[in-house]
Amino acid sequence: MMRLGLVVGYSGSRIELPMDLVKAADEMGYYALWTSEAYGSDAVTPLAWMGAQTQHIKLGTAIMQMPGRSPAMTAMTAMTLDQLSGGRFLLGLGLSGPQVAEGWHGVAYGKPLGKTREYVEICRKIFKREEALVHEGEHYGVPYRGEDATGLGKPLKSILHSRPDIPIYLASIGPKNVTLTAEIADGWLPFIFSPRHYDSVYKTQIDEGFAKAGGGKGIHNFDIAPSISVIIDDDLENAYNRVKPLLALYIGGMGAKDKNFYN
């Protein structure tokens, strides 16, 4: 089943939300609003603002940057917004890239597959509240036990009672990341996605992830939520020209000259 969403994205030098469009999408039965972030406006605050002025539409991040937040901070934010919105939040996560992780957030980009798996695992533990949080992994350790630890940290359980199954979506591009997404996430946020090439490019990777997940997971209970640019214009050439700058930014100008994950 196909559902429609509205991508609000992130701001330029000033944040201006298209509230007329947002309210219309809510009234017309659109499935979700999606926000994003780079190194300016964040993805969550606009959703809180829009969520307070809508009733039905789901509120998704596409994406919240994992390097910018600890897993616990992300889980706290997700639980808070989900409860305030009446269970409408969709947690979309992504690693961004080395340029933003290291150049903006000041943390190592590291090993994306391992970090993503642990990050999602910690978030789900916090949502479920089955026990106090303990995680001992290669990339994250909770409670912190490093050489500079005080030794006073102890396992904690969220005070806020959350919906235990807040949906988690992952943005992924590389084959191994796509497989990981199908294995551990509830949905996938692909970029520059062409449905006609799904079988030849992505199907094997997605099916491999489903097989690793087990439990009857498959395309029937997994969301694929690509974003596309829609331009309404009687002049086809003019419509093309309005789309080209965004594509050029990601394909040719995003990241470093010798390392761009989008091309």
What are the residue ranges of the model-derived segments?
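N-terminal beta1-alpha1-beta2 module of alpha/beta enzyme domains
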Residues: 1-61, 67, 166
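Hydrophobic faces of well-ordered beta-strands that scaffold small-molecule active sites
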Residues: 4-8, 33-35, 59-62, 89-93, ...
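An alpha-helical appendage that flanks or caps ligand/catalytic pockets
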Residues: 110-158, 199-263
